[in-house]
């Protein structure tokens, strides 16, 4: 079954993904990949014993390139026809492709016509022709603010008939966010890259809310 981006591409539209998560995370992956299980995001995670949640009986062995499948999520991102993909997850692209230990997934993306960018300033000079793959952090993009003294958000608790609220805490600027693109900056760059009379489909995800 074709996904929405494949249908848009077939209709002549430009296609793009912008996310503050890894570009291999579940939401962006659903627009770019066909896979049995969301955690089969790299070639070495395709078999049940290597999957992040081994208690699940699901395996993606049948999706491996070596078995005639389309490959892991990251391999499918690298071989996709997307015009622009911006987010995090650069570490996923350092692994080698299934069946070819001499080629990394990042190199595979370049072979497929992607220009890989990594820095905020690169958004101001996107190539006019090549596909663009922006990988601005090793995993999910850092959030803009963090709790003072390492404070983390806590769940609301319930004791009997009473709701127990966690203690509020102050936030401060997150130094890890320095040099990172905002969701707005990535979205603006993607629209600028895709804008044409043919039209485009762009999926934009503010993913950080469920990563903290």
Where are these regions (language model features)?
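Short acidic, glycine-rich surface-loop motifs adjacent to enzyme active sites
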Residues: 197-212
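Membrane-embedded translocation segments of transport machinery
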Residues: 170-173, 189-193, 211-212
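Long hydrophobic segments that form regular secondary structure
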Residues: 179-194, 200
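A structural signal for short secondary-structure junctions
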Residues: 127, 195-196
